[in-house]
Amino acid sequence: MPTTQKTLMFLSGFLTSLGSVVVICSILGTQAWITSKIFFTDTISNGTIAITYGLFRGTSSQDLNEGLQELDKNFEVLGILSNSSQKSLHVVVIILLILSLAASLLSSMFTFYNSISNPYQTFLGPMGVYTWNGLSASFVFLTMVLFVGNVDSNHLSEKLSQTLYPDAINKKTTHTYGYSFWLILLVILLNIVTVVIIIFYQKARYHQKQEQRKPVEYAPRDGILF
């Protein structure tokens, strides 16, 4: 059976890993990733289009300076994107986030298993925890980078706008990233905290072993013989 110290520290790691799982599920399920405001003109008027969307769903609204504006629209992101580089990169972003979720799930399983068992010298021990948290943080960081690249360099919002409002001619676009996007940083922080907890446990375990060896190392030779 593991010591009380090990149980408590690995349970703490389990809670932070489970926290990252919950946060990633929230990121996947919410649509407050980004709000893009697009200034446009068309044949009879001009105004702005506001598009708020996440990985799967979004909403758009139109504000015209004059004329009759369209009703707000709900849309499926992948559903209205044609086979394009924007759609391909968006799919990669989703896959990376799902991989990060899987890695965080495995981290939570490994930390919980270590809190009730002693697979210390195998991959099921701290090495496995380090691996899964490193992968989770890497996948979610790539998710952030690729999403920003798809929006800023690949003009994802403009592509969605052109599909929703084909008559509008885009002039200028501004982006505001929402809480769903910034929660990615919380996932990375939770991954780091999990690793730090296990590192502290390993250091404490090493010092305990060193303390246990000292009485034998410094005992008189006669005492050791008899």
Curated annotation (Swiss-Prot):
Keyword Nucleotide-binding found: no
Membrane topology annotation: Multi-pass membrane protein
Membrane spanning residue stretches: 8-28, 92-112, 128-148, 181-201
Stretch forming the signal peptide: none
GO terms classed as biological process: sensory perception of sound
Localization annotation: Membrane
Domain of life of the organism encoding this protein: Eukaryota
Glycoprotein recorded as keyword: yes
Keyword set, alphabetical order: Glycoprotein, Membrane, Transmembrane, Transmembrane helix
GO cellular component: a single term: membrane
Glycosylation sites: N46, N83
Ranges in a coiled coil: none
Entries under InterPro entries matching the protein: Clarin
UniProt family annotation: Belongs to the clarin family.
Protein name: Clarin-3
Species the sequence originates in: Rattus norvegicus
Name of the encoding gene: Clrn3
